[in-house]
From Swiss-Prot:
The lineage of its organism: Bacteria, Bacillati, Bacillota, Bacilli, Lactobacillales. This is Probable 2-(5''-triphosphoribosyl)-3'-dephosphocoenzyme-A synthase. Its EC number is 2.4.2.52. It comes from the Bacteria. It comes from Streptococcus pyogenes serotype M6 (strain ATCC BAA-946 / MGAS10394). PANTHER family: 2-(5''-TRIPHOSPHORIBOSYL)-3'-DEPHOSPHOCOENZYME-A SYNTHASE, TRIPHOSPHORIBOSYL-DEPHOSPHO-COA SYNTHASE. Belongs to the CitG/MdcB family. One of its GO terms (molecular function) is triphosphoribosyl-dephospho-CoA synthase activity. Keywords: ATP-binding, Nucleotide-binding, Transferase. One of its GO terms (biological process) is prosthetic group biosynthetic process. It catalyses: 3'-dephospho-CoA + ATP = 2'-(5''-triphospho-alpha-D-ribosyl)-3'-dephospho-CoA + adenine.
Length: 294
């Protein structure tokens, strides 16, 4: 019974990634219609990546459940080791293309935290599907003590390095903390912004319209390292401003799709991709499935 429940939840994580890549149109991002601002990946590349990562989603939640009483840092280390192996398998599947590196990191922590939370709340194991927004908040809060050390440990000594990863370079140049920052703060962008917004949207609109509006909302608020990496601070600020204006127009679903299609070409021309917003979109979907919003 326990394994079946954990398996079903890990499949919701995979489903969240599938929903994210399938949502269309998404400006600058890979979707069903085109490859956005990416010339090295496609919809099929994302499918290959997800299939490679899927077994690890199961491992993340099972690890959290099995080691729920362990010190948070020790649980983090277990999850990170699994996540690094998953990353290797992902890169093999995509021939070296980074489709889900940051999202895999975040999902490892959130699935691990979900497993740990389930071990402490056995009623959810027998009454699966009754996750509340309070449960979501509690799961995200479990990540905070696991990652309290992370910024200092990973980014505090970069002055001794000569070569930086993409994430390290963003921190050195702009102070952008990326997925590490989200995790160390307990995913407050999710709990305080994305999920409240989506709960409101889904109560008023059909699922696809709600998802598209959520994407626009995230693009208007997220500190998006992908955009900043590709275009700098001003390009990122420009995208945020454009998305705020789009939200204010309160367009019909048909007009919203047309506007997003047009903006997609704009971002393609500038080689801009809001990958940070896309990752948070997928994470929001994961909790939306747990809460039965979708």
């Amino acid at each position: 019974m326990t394994k079946a429940v954990l398996t079903s939840i890990s499949q919701l994580a995979l489903k969240a990634l599938l929903y994210e890549v399938s949502l269309s149109p998404k400006p600058g991002l890979v979707d069903r219609f085109d490859n956005g601002a990416h010339d090295d990946m496609s919809f099929m590349t994302f499918i290959d990546s997800m299939i490679a990562l899927s077994p690890f989603f199961q491992a993340y939640i099972e690890t959290g459940f099995a080691y729920a009483k362990e010190e948070p840092l020790l649980l983090f280390n277990r999850l990170r080791q699994l996540g690094q192996k998953a990353e290797e398998i992902m890169f093999c599947a995509t021939q070296g293309i980074n489709t889900h590196k940051g999202l895999n990191f975040s999902m490892a922590l959130l699935l691990g935290a979900t497993g740990a939370y389930l071990a402490r709340t056995p009623h959810l194991m027998t009454d699966l599907g009754c996750f509340s927004k309070e449960d979501t908040l509690a799961i995200c809060r479990l990540v905070k003590p696991m990652t309290a050390h992370l910024i200092q440990a990973d980014l505090g000594h970069l002055n001794t390095k000569k070569e930086f990863t993409y994430g390290e370079q963003l921190f050195v140049t702009y102070g952008i903390k990326g997925p590490r920052g989200e995790a160390s703060e307990g995913f407050t962008t999710l709990t305080d912004h994305a999920l409240p917004y989506f709960r409101q949207m889904i109560s008023q609109n059909d699922p696809e319209t709600s998802q598209l509006r959520l994407l626009v909302y995230l693009m208007s608020i997220v500190e998006d390292g992908n955009l900043i990496h590709r275009g700098g601070i001003e390009a990122w600020k420009g995208v945020k401003a454009d998305m705020r204006l789009l939200l204010q127009q309160d367009l019909s679903t048909t007009d919203l799709r047309l506007a997003l299609s047009s903006y997609n070409q704009c971002l393609i021309n500038q080689h801009l991709s809001p990958g940070g917003a896309a990752d948070l979109l997928a994470l929001t979907f994961y909790f939306a499935f747990l809460e039965k919003l979708l």
